[in-house]
C-alpha cells in the first residue's frame, strides 16, 4: 500500500475511477484507462456519447474573459532540451492551453483537432469542483459545517467505519477507512468496488452502490491522522452533497456556478451506477470554462458582490490542511512545490493557480498513460515558464 501511494503521489494524482464506476452507453465500450490515442481524441470531447451523463445547464450571461493585449511565447528547458510551447503541446498531446492573469487571457491554444467550443473531460478535476459545491452548500445552510458527521447526512453508514468521521476529514482524504487504489490488483477496492457495490445494493431500494460498498470497509487509522487518496470516498462526498442539497450535482453546479457566474456552454457530468453524478470524476467543459472555474475560486466565490461560498472557504480549501508526502493537500485541491494550488486529473488535466500573481493556467491533454514523473515534470516546466513569462514586464 505504501508503494502504491508513493507511486500515485509521484504521478500528481491517482486514477479517477475504474471503468465500472460509470455506466457505458454501449456494452462493448473499452476501459477508459486504456483508450487508444485515437479514442482519446474522439471521446474526451464527447463523453456524453460514451457514458451516461447529466447536463449542467448554462444561463444567458457569459463571464467575459477579454484578451490582455499581449501574448506569451516562452522558450524553456526540460529533460535536457529546449522547448517552445507548440513543441510541448505536440509532444505531450495537449488539446487546450489557457493562461489568464487578472481576468484577462494571455494565451489560448488548441491541439488534437479541438476547437474553442469543444468540451473536454476533467477526470479528477471534478473533485475540486465538488469541494466548491460543498462550500456553497454550507453557505446555503444545507450543510451545518465541515464538522458535520458523515453519518448525519448518510445514516446508511451508521455502524460502519465511518462512525465518527466528519465531512472535513473526507475532504482531506483522511477518513482512516481502509482503501486500496491499486489498478494492477483486481482485488483492490478501486477495481472491485463498483461491481461489488452494485451486487450489495440489489434488493435494497434507494441504496446507492457506492454507499453499499464503502460501508463494508474496515478502519485502518484514526480519522484525520493519515492522508490516503480515495476516489471511492470522493464519490461518497458527491452522494452526501446531493442528499444535503436535495438535487443532483449537475443541477446544483448550474444553480451556484454555471448560470450565475456565466459559463459559456452547458457542461456534462458522468453518473455512477446509481444514477448520481460522480463527485470524483468526469465533468466536461470548454477550455475557457475551466479557466472560469479557476477564476471563480481565485475571486473567493463572489459573484456580483454576492458570496456563493462562506467567508474564507476558498482560501482554506486551497491551502494545506494535511501532509501528503508532497507540498500538502487541501479540500480536494493539491498544493504544489512552486507555491500554486492545483486541481488535477489523470491523462494531463489541470487548473493551476498562483494566488499572489493572480495567474490561472489550464492544461487539457491526452497523455499516453495516466501519469508519472516524466509527464508531471514536463507539465510543471511548461507551467513555470508560462508563469515567468506572464509576470515579466511587457515588451
Pin down the residues of each PLM region.
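Bacterial N-terminal signal peptides that target proteins for export
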Residues: 1-8
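Active-site-proximal alpha-helical segments within enzyme catalytic domains
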Residues: 232-240, 279-302, 349-366
Amino acid at each position: 500500500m505504501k508503494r502504491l501511494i508513493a507511486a500515485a503521489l509521484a504521478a500528481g494524482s491517482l486514477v479517477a475511477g475504474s471503468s465500472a464506476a460509470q455506466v457505458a452507453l454501449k456494452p462493448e465500450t473499452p476501459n477508459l484507462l486504456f483508450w487508444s490515442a485515437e479514442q482519446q481524441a474522439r471521446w474526451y470531447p464527447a463523453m456524453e456519447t460514451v457514458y451516461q451523463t447529466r447536463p449542467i445547464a448554462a444561463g444567458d450571461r457569459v463571464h467575459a474573459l477579454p484578451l490582455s493585449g499581449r501574448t506569451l511565447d516562452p522558450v524553456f528547458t526540460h529533460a535536457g532540451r529546449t522547448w517552445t510551447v507548440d513543441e510541448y503541446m505536440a509532444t505531450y498531446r495537449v488539446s487546450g492551453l489557457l493562461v489568464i492573469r487578472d481576468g484577462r487571457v494571455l494565451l489560448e491554444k488548441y491541439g488534437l483537432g479541438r476547437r474553442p467550443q469543444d468540451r473536454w473531460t476533467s477526470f479528477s478535476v471534478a473533485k475540486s469542483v465538488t469541494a466548491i459545491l460543498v462550500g456553497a452548500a454550507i453557505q446555503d445552510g444545507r450543510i451545518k459545517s465541515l464538522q458535520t458527521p458523515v453519518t448525519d447526512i448518510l445514516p446508511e453508514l451508521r455502524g460502519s467505519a465511518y462512525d465518527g468521521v466528519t465531512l472535513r476529514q473526507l475532504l482531506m482524504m483522511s477518513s482512516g477507512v481502509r482503501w486500496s487504489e491499486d489498478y494492477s490488483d483486481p482485488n483492490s477496492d478501486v477495481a472491485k468496488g463498483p461491481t461489488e457495490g452494485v451486487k450489495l445494493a440489489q434488493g435494497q431500494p434507494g441504496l446507492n452502490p457506492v454507499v453499499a460498498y464503502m460501508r463494508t470497509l474496515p478502519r485502518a487509522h484514526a480519522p484525520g491522522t493519515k492522508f490516503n487518496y480515495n476516489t471511492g470516498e470522493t464519490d461518497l462526498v458527491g452522494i452526501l452533497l446531493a442528499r444535503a442539497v436535495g438535487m443532483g450535482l449537475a443541477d446544483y453546479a448550474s444553480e451556484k456556478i454555471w448560470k450565475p457566474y456565466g459559463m459559456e456552454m452547458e457542461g456534462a457530468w458522468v453518473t455512477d451506477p446509481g444514477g448520481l453524478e460522480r463527485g470524483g470524476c468526469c465533468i466536461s467543459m470548454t477550455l475557457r470554462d475551466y479557466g472560469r472555474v479557476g477564476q471563480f475560486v481565485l475571486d473567493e466565490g463572489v459573484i456580483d458582490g454576492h458570496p456563493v461560498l462562506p467567508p474564507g472557504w476558498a482560501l482554506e480549501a486551497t491551502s494545506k490542511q494535511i501532509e501528503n508526502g508532497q507540498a500538502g493537500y487541501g479540500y480536494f485541491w493539491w498544493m504544489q512545490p512552486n507555491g500554486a494550488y492545483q486541481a488535477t486529473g489523470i491523462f494531463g488535466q489541470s487548473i493551476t493557480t498562483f494566488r499572489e500573481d493572480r495567474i490561472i493556467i489550464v492544461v487539457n491533454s491526452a497523455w499516453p498513460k495516466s501519469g508519472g514523473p516524466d509527464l508531471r515534470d514536463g507539465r510543471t516546466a511548461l507551467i513555470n515558464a508560462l508563469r515567468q513569462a506572464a509576470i515579466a514586464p511587457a515588451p
